[in-house]
Amino acid sequence: MNDRNLTGKMKENYRFFGIGTALYAGFYTLCLYKNSGGIAFTFFIAGSLWFYCLCMKKLEVSLKKGSIFYLVTVMLLAVSTFITGDGRIIAMNKTGIFFLTASFLLHQFFEDKNWSFFKYMENIIKLPFVWIAKVHRPFVDFHKKENEKQDNNALYVVLGLLVGIPLLIVVWGLLCAADAAFARISRNIFGSLNFGSGFQIVFMVLAAFFVTYGIFAYLAERSLSDEAREKTPAEALPAIIVLIPLTVLYMVFCWIQIFCLFGGNFNMQGMTYAEYARRGFFDLLAVCILNLILVQAGYGFFKKNKVLDITMTVMSACTYIMIASSAFRMIQYVKHYNLTFLRVFVLWFLVVLTVLLTGVIISIFKRSFPLFRFSMVVVTVCYLLLSFAHVDYWIASYNLHRGETAGTASYHMGHTDYSYLRYMSSDAALAFREYIEDGGKEAASADEGVWYGEDGEREYFVLEEDWLTYYTKRMDTRYEKMGIRGFNLSQYIANKVLHGN
């Protein structure tokens, strides 16, 4: 269309956007009030995507090619949140949902084909805050059509919803205080209601309304440039001078890794495996982020130069060896100290980083390569595998069965860290049940804890109760507090498994 700005269409459909956003704000509060990962969260995400698509239909914004990927992956993450009890996975799922939803909206309203990696990230991070400059828009849009009867009615409906929903909650809280039976039923659905929770609900409704309306008002303006700005690239010589010494340093470092670490000529020199693995990983992460920035700057701000391209390629290739070095050290660490969620995440991240570096190298020689989209797809697909894997199940299964190999040279002192098992998520319950059925009842009653002293050596202590009893009590407490909106499939299965159902 010639007129890219859709603000006029949004104002013409104020009745829909005003009432629809108010209802959406109520739906948001109903689903997410004191509910972080239950079935209501999954319904909220599904409802949100439907509402966004409905808004775009009103603005005559057609679903673009590639948008299905965003819609499907967001829903998969929402389903994953419902079927896992791991708070770390749930938190990362929500982060992924935010980035994918923001990318979906930007992709729908703007021609983002020529956006650079940094421009995409800038717009995604900026999107949650654009509503601040549009907080007045609901009132302005109404005022423009104030003489039209239907728009007066629309405003009255919006005001009625914004006032009526909080008032309903306050009265509901009073009724809960007046009758124990009514309070118990309400608590199973919404949790405890009082004046404090009423204030919180009012805030959630108002915040959801103004944030959602403001974001769509911003998107409707289509104020972002569709094309990458034409800039005169700088001479490549300064970049070459900066990158060549770094590349030489990387090559020396990689040679040392190959000769000393992979060649078996390595001496820990007093460092524990924990210190060595953690230092190696986080240092590598910093170097890889730096490499990404340097490569982006190299082909984004400097003229194409053969020497520069080769230098950046060698620098990126050296990172492969750094990744292999980090993975080798982490695997040795796991052999001695078993698995934890962080150690699994480190290994997963190294695999993802290897694939991402391939995209970075391609982008050096093919400037038009869509690095952001490539990175988005790689990270999303790999993370979905991690999210649906129920990591705690595999960690618990591995650690418990490794305990049966106590005394082997590769297993540090032949001990299982039972204190770690006590605090695992509901995803681990099935592994515990399988282990006990395989004859591990003695280990299930172990009361041994472990911690690391200042010298890195393991020290042991006696727990007040065995780890399985403590874990079962934790799961029972969570199951009892779950409620209808917070119903979680993993918590439900854990309760049945632990009690032999």
Feature annotation, model-predicted:
Residues 93-108, 195-223, 239, 246-251, ...:
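Terminal, non-globular segments
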Residues 369-392:
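Internal/C-terminal transmembrane anchor helices
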Residues 2-15, 56-66, 112-119, 138-155, ...:
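Juxtamembrane membrane-water interface segments of multi-pass membrane proteins
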